Amino acid sequence: MSGTTISSDRPNICAICHQKAFGYNYEVVSCNACKMFFRRAHAEKIDDFCKKGGKCFDGDDLLTSRPKCRSCRYKKCVNLGMRYHNSSESQTQSDEEPSPKQSVVAVVPQHIITQAHIDSTFFQHLHALNETRYNAYCVINICEDPSFCDLVAQGSKLSVYLRPQEIEWENTERKLKPWGSLGVLLAVEVCKGLSFYNDLLLSDRVLLLKNVAFKSHHLSVAYDSFIQKKGRVLAPTGTEMFPDVLFEIPKCREIIMDLLTSPMKPLMELQITESEYLLLNMIVICNPAIQGMSPSGQDLLSRHQQVYARILLQMCMVSNPRTGPGRYAAILAINQRLDRQSVITNRVVQCLREYWAPNFFFSKILTEACRSDVYY
C-alpha cells in the first residue's frame, strides 16, 4: 500500500518553522523543507553569522513568514534534537569492530519534547481549569461582597465556593441569585490558576482581575450555553439568569435579551470548538494593554498572549490553510465584541432600578469591572 499515513496522535506541526509536518525527520517532528535544510546544512558545515542577535527563529509567528537566517534555523534544529546519522559511517564502524558473539540490541525510542508536545500540556491545564470553573458554577452559593483588592489578598477561594451555603436570596438585599457576580468570582479563580499570575506585582494582579475577569466570565457562560445548544445564556442549572417577572416588563426584556444573546452569536456563527474557546479566553485574560500596568507586567502578559495566539493560528491553519487566516481573525474579533457587555450591563441595571427595584444591589467587583454603579 503506497502513500503516507499520518497518525492521529502524532504532532503534525514542524517544531522548527511551525509549518505543516508529516512525521519525524532526524528524530524531530519537522516539515520536508526543514529536513532538507538540515541535511544540506550538516553537509556544508554551516557557520553563517546571524546579523540580528541569533533570535530569528525565536518568534511565535513563523507561519506567514519563515525567516531566511540559515544560522538561526540550523541552531534551532540542533537545539530541538535533530541528529544526522550517516549510514555508511555506521556500517564501516561496525565492520571494523566485529562483536565476538551475536547480541540482541533493544532499540529504545528517544522521547523528544517538541513545541507540539508543550502546546498539548497547555490544553490539558486549560481544560482542567475550565472544567473546575464550570463545576463550581453549578454549585456556588455564597453571599459575600469582596473587592478585587480583597480577592488578591485572600488567595484562592475555590474550596469555599465548592461548599455551597443555604441562602434564600429573595430575603437578602440582592433579591435574586447574582449569577453575574458569582461567575466573575470564578473567572478570578481561573486567573489565579494560571502559571504567570504569581509572577505579577500585587498592583498588577488587581488591575488584571478588574479588567479581564468580567469579559472572561461572559465568554465562558456564553460557551457553556453554546455547547448545550441553547439560544441564549442560561444559568448552569438550566434556568433563566433573571426572574420571570423581569421578562414581563417590555423595556427590561429587550435589554436583558440583548445581554444574554450578544456573546453567543459569534460562537454560533463560527461553531467554535472547545480548543478555540480555551485559547481565546487566555488571549482575553492576557491583555498587555491594561492602563496602569507596570512594564514588567505588560511584558509578561504580552509574551503569554503571543504564545496562545500562535497556537490558535496554527490550529486554524492546520484545519484549513485556505480559510485559516479568516477564521483566526474572526475568533479574535469576539474579544472586541465582548466589550459591549459592560455597556449593555449598565443599561440592564438602570432599567431594573427604574422599573423593578429602585435600590437594586450592585456588588463591588461589578462596580469596579464596569466602572459604574450598576449591574445584575
UniProtKB/Swiss-Prot annotation:
SUPFAM superfamilies linked to this entry: Glucocorticoid receptor-like (DNA-binding domain), Nuclear receptor ligand-binding domain
Function description: Orphan nuclear receptor.
Pfam families per the UniProt record, alphabetical: Hormone_recep, zf-C4
Keyword Zinc-finger part of the UniProt annotation: yes
Gene3D superfamilies reported for this sequence: Erythroid Transcription Factor GATA-1, subunit A (3.30.50.10), Retinoid X Receptor (1.10.565.10)
Xref: InterPro entries: HNF4-like_DBD (IPR049636), NHR-like_dom_sf (IPR035500), Nucl_hrmn_rcpt_lig-bd (IPR000536), Znf_hrmn_rcpt (IPR001628), Znf_NHR/GATA (IPR013088)
Entry keyword set: DNA-binding, Metal-binding, Nucleus, Receptor, Transcription, Transcription regulation, Zinc, Zinc-finger
Keyword Transport listed: no
Zinc fingers (NR C4-type), renumbered ranges: 14-34, 50-72
NR LBD domain mapped to chain residues: 125-371
Entry GO CC: nucleus
Domain of life: Eukaryota
DNA-binding residue intervals: 11-89
GO terms of molecular function: DNA-binding transcription factor activity; RNA polymerase II cis-regulatory region sequence-specific DNA binding; zinc ion binding
UniProt protein name: Nuclear hormone receptor family member nhr-124
Subcellular location: Nucleus
Family statement drawn from the similarity comment of this UniProt entry: Belongs to the nuclear hormone receptor family.
Gene that encodes it: nhr-124
